[in-house]
Swiss-Prot record:
GO terms for molecular function: serine-type endopeptidase activity. Residues 42-45 form a propeptide. Disulfide bonds join 67-83, 187-202, 213-242. Residues 46-266 form the Peptidase S1 domain. CDD domains: Tryp_SPc (cd00190). The active site is at 82 (charge relay system), 127 (charge relay system), 217 (charge relay system). Belongs to the peptidase S1 family. This is Trypsin-like protease. Transmembrane segments: none annotated. Keywords: Disulfide bond, Hydrolase, Protease, Serine protease, Signal, Zymogen. It comes from the Bacteria. It is an enzyme of class 3 (hydrolase). The record marks 211 as: Required for specificity.
Length: 268
């Protein structure tokens, strides 16, 4: 990715991002990891993070096409729309849960049965999707934010994506890191009209160095609520590069779509 022709990449792979048509609008960027589609998803991990302990984030899941996700219900995974190939019956996805190390003998593997992509998703905003599982996974679920109350502060990101931009190798050990909220105004300074403020959140350090990357797409961005419990505020969506100085990662704003997600889940 060059500075003269900036290409936004979904955090699930090195494929062109949903907003690549606006290439060149930004000079530098720090990207999150997401693939444009399941067919092009690439494994990746959190940059600048450290290994997560077993059971530290028991709601985290890994998807076989190279994306992440979180247990919304014990039999439903919340992930990114750009990781999917559309809605409908789908038995091709293998969901791995219950472990921080994907090579662990204790890994729980369950197949998908259906996928529901956000209604009206066209690659710009609305980057969420649900995966119905063949059977429930007996692990804790991750509550999602239903208001914007928790959309500021410091967030936790986690994933099995690249630890270096362009690595394309991912990691078998879950990585974690913390990133601060970035205002819409500051984020638009970098992304311009490619950002959809009402539907997306930005997070990252001005100095770069810590970010999601290819292979982290679909994973949750979360923080503690007033009761000290984890709550999901974002979904790893897209960005320009990974952990570059001066450009934050972009995440789906979960609270905006909470009612739509609940409605879609009840119909799966």
């Amino acid at each position: 990715m060059t500075h003269t022709t900036t290409i936004a990449a979904k955090r699930g792979g090195l494929a062109l991002a949903k907003k690549a048509a606006a290439a060149g609008a930004v000079a530098l960027a720090v990207a999150s990891l997401q693939p444009v589609s399941a067919a092009h998803a690439a494994d990746a991990r959190v940059i600048g993070g450290k290994p997560a302990a077993q059971n530290e984030f028991p709601f985290m899941v890994h998807l076989s096409m190279g994306c992440g996700g979180a247990l919304y219900k014990k039999d439903i995974v919340l992930t990114a729309a750009h990781c999917m190939d559309g809605s409908g019956n789908n038995t091709r996805i293998t969901v791995t849960a219950g472990v921080a190390d994907l090579n662990s003998s204790g890994a729980i593997k369950v197949k998908s049965t259906k996928v529901k992509v956000a209604p009206g998703y066209d690659g710009v905003g609305k980057d969420w999707a649900l995966i119905k599982l063949a059977k429930p996974i007996d692990r804790p679920t991750l509550k999602i934010a239903t208001t914007a109350k928790y959309n500021r502060g410091t967030f936790t990101i986690a994933g099995w994506g690249d630890v270096r931009e362009g690595a394309g190798t991912g990691t078998t050990k879950l990585q974690k890191a913390n990133v601060p909220f970035v205002s819409d105004r500051a984020c638009k300074w970098h992304y311009g009209n490619r950002l959809v403020p009402k539907q997306e959140l930005c997070a990252g350090y001005a100095s770069g160095g810590i970010d999601t990357c290819q292979g982290d797409s679909g994973g949750p961005m979360f923080r503690k609520d007033d009761a000290g419990k984890w709550i999901q505020v974002g979904i790893v969506s897209w960005g320009d590069g990974c952990a570059r100085s001066g450009v934050p990662g972009v995440y789906t704003e979960v609270s905006t779509f909470a009612k739509d997600i609940a409605k879609a889940a009840s119909a799966l």
